Amino acid sequence: FPYTTLFRSDPFESNFCKFFLRNFNYLKLKRLICTSYSASPIVGQQLTLVGWDEEPIKRGNGYVMDISEIPMANGRGISDSDIDSLLKSKKSGVKRLKGDGDFRSDECIEYMKQADIVVTNPPFSLFREYVALLMKYDKKFLIIGNQNNITYKEIFPLIQENKIWLGCKYGDMAFRVPDYYKPRNTRYWEDENGQKWRSFGTICWYTNLDHQKRHEDLVLYKNYYGNEEDYPKYDNYDAINVNKVANIPKDYFECMAVPITYVDKHNPNQFEIINANDIRTNPDTPIKAHGLIKDKDAVITTQIYAKKRRKRLDTNSRSEEHTSELQSRRVI
């Protein structure tokens, strides 16, 4: 069934744009809409585009590309030169926006409303706002974000309610970067063609499109009973602590606090993600908007656990503050 796909991107040099143009027919798209933000530093760096008004694209106003047909050039898709020719033609579907292409503008929101699926890499600093718009207009989406977004008070409740989940790729991702990008000491390289690359270990896809990985059971090997000292209870929550996803016990069916990395492996048919506020055992423990076990309230003072922890520390200078820091990554 054909879809109308919207992606908000850097100008049409964006690999998001190129991917969907190349694969327009292969993906059986009905329509492709791309809104472009005028303040991007890569405007006009690779392609010189001409809008419907026959003026070259330049900074100031944003632009939109709205395409419903791409001629089959080489079977599956089209080449970069085909893309260049297409976008320079009067049939390119490119026109100037009234504003700068900010996704929060009325005209960009109107384009979002027309889309069946939204695919993009939103500004990380505006991730909350972008997701809020997607939810407001009930859009299917596939977007890139940081792993830390999981813990946002605006995001984690959506994950808990199975309104958002992670995509198939989680963690290490490599990205092409422009020629002007300055070399870095780590996670940076150039390939044999001189293309610059960077990789990031904290990037993932967020989506509400179902996929097979989401329904794969997490294989469990550990036992809780007989190893209770390895799973101490929290002082302020009715839950045991599990240090690693690999240590989730197969014979325990009550509440467990697990590392945030579990979310990538969550199968809603196998486990339920709950709100930590619902299992508070200390009435003085404040209600947390994000619903996680973290911060200073995520303490464990079980003597056996404290003894084992001290053995792993190099000195006795590590205090309860250190323990709280370790626990801050746990999630119900």
Cite the ranges covered by each PLM segment.
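Amphipathic alpha-helical repeat scaffolds
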Residues: 117-123
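C-terminal lobe and adjacent flexible extensions of AdoMet/dcAdoMet transferase-like proteins
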Residues: 228-320, 324, 328
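Conserved beta-strand signature within the Rossmann-like core of class I S-adenosyl-L-methionine
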Residues: 139-152, 163, 167
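A conserved mid-domain beta-alpha-beta active-site/ligand-binding segment of alpha/beta enzyme cores
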Residues: 169-268
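Short, small-residue-biased leader/transition segments that mark boundaries at the very start
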Residues: 2-6, 325-327
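A short, conserved alpha-helix within the catalytic core of class I
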Residues: 126-133
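Class I S-adenosyl-L-methionine-dependent methyltransferase module
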Residues: 7-102, 157, 165-167, 171-184, ...
